[in-house]
């Protein structure tokens, strides 16, 4: 075999291996982002806010505290009286290096859209979460209250 043909084959093989490794890392990140976002959503929308806050960045804790301060005992009773808990499904994940944008569909959740008023149960809604990678761990990064669009 000609030396240049060997060189081309070696470079091609190296490129293919690099793409395989990159896609494996990407698949690993996709799975980790999906698991984090779904676990956060399941806890957040079922008012298990302590468990949800563990999955957040440090700067998100003030927004978790803000949300918790606006949940009344009546809201908790309404959620607990539901036959089915809130369910979250991930519809899209867009990863860019150490950040990710996740689109989530939520079913059977408490909609708290006005301060000072009790929440109400909603059948279905959509929201978007931002996640950040901190020391190899994906965490939800809240920059304000979660905005949910009711469907």
Please place each PLM-identified region on the residue numbering:
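Short, low-complexity N-terminal intrinsically disordered segments enriched in polar/charged residues
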Residues: 4, 21-46, 54
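Sec-dependent bacterial lipoprotein signal peptides
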Residues: 1-23
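Exposed beta-sheet edge and beta->alpha loop/turn motif
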Residues: 95-151
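Short solvent-exposed beta->alpha transition segments
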Residues: 49-97, 101, 107-110
